[in-house]
Amino acid sequence: MKKTLIITAAAALTACSNVPAPQLQSMQSYQVEWIGERPLIDSSMLTLTLLDSNRASGMAGCNTWTAEYQLKDDHFSLDSIATTRKLCAPALMEQEQRFLAALADVQRWEFAEHQQLLLWPAQGAPIKLWPTEQSDQH
């Protein structure tokens, strides 16, 4: 009986280790929930979409943004971030600047519980994002 239980437990553990880890997917969009230690301003929309050809884009709250990204294993970084230049309310503009600065500082990614994407800077708390429906944005 003990031997059967041990074999069953070992088989179950082996099966769990064969589940592939979730990966970042191109053409997937994410909606930002937190920037570091702070939640978003109510009704503001910040997004990130990973496009083909190592491009990313999204909404920064007031302006749209685009960048090149590098992805290798759990390392992730955004380079050459560019935005449109609309003006919005001061609080929204401040949040947008924090978001863009946080994006520029991202060094790695991971999925937390329930497929929440965490983009980690060199120091401090991550940007927290949730997946949205598949996107056709370009």
Give each language-model segment a name:
Residues 1-14:
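Sec-dependent bacterial lipoprotein signal peptides
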Residues 16-138:
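Lipid interaction determinants
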